[in-house]
Structure formats: C-alpha cells, structure tokens
C-alpha cells in the first residue's frame, strides 16, 4: 500500500475528533506493510498541512470542512 492509499484512511479516522497518536497507529496498523509507512503518511499529511499534533499528543485535521 502506498502513502497515497493511506491518506484517506488516516483522515477518515480523524474526521470526528482528534485521536491520540498511538491510538491512530493502532487503527491504521492493519493497512500497513511496515511501521515506517505510518511515519510516511503522517509526514505527508503534515507537509500538506492537512493534519497536526497538539500538545496533548492528539492528531487532528487542519483542513477546512
């Protein structure tokens, strides 16, 4: 699975509320071939300013709805 395949999966997990980083990883893990795939998709979303991490360790969507 490519990083682009994972982007909508991650965004879907974040659509209702911020999610703790570890919990997000656990939810996405079944779709990963390697743990570095998670790092890649998170880097991509951060670079696109689509997701960020708050001071509580929660990942949240930055995109306007």
Predicted regions and their residues:
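Minor-groove-contacting beta-hairpin "wing" of winged helix-turn-helix DNA-binding domains
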Residues: 58-63
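Short amphipathic alpha-helical segments
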Residues: 8, 21-22, 39-42
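Short alpha-helical segments that sit at the start of domains
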Residues: 1-13, 65
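Short amphipathic alpha-helical interaction segments
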Residues: 32-44
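Short acidic, hydrophobic short linear motifs in intrinsically disordered regions
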Residues: 17-28
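A short, conserved structural fragment
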Residues: 46-56
């Amino acid at each position: 699975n490519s990083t682009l395949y994972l982007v909508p999966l991650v965004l879907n997990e974040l659509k209702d509320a911020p999610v703790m980083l570890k919990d997000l990883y656990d939810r996405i893990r079944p779709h990963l071939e390697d743990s570095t795939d998670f790092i890649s998709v998170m880097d991509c979303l951060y670079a696109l300013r689509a997701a960020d991490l708050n001071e509580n360790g929660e990942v949240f969507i930055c995109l306007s709805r």
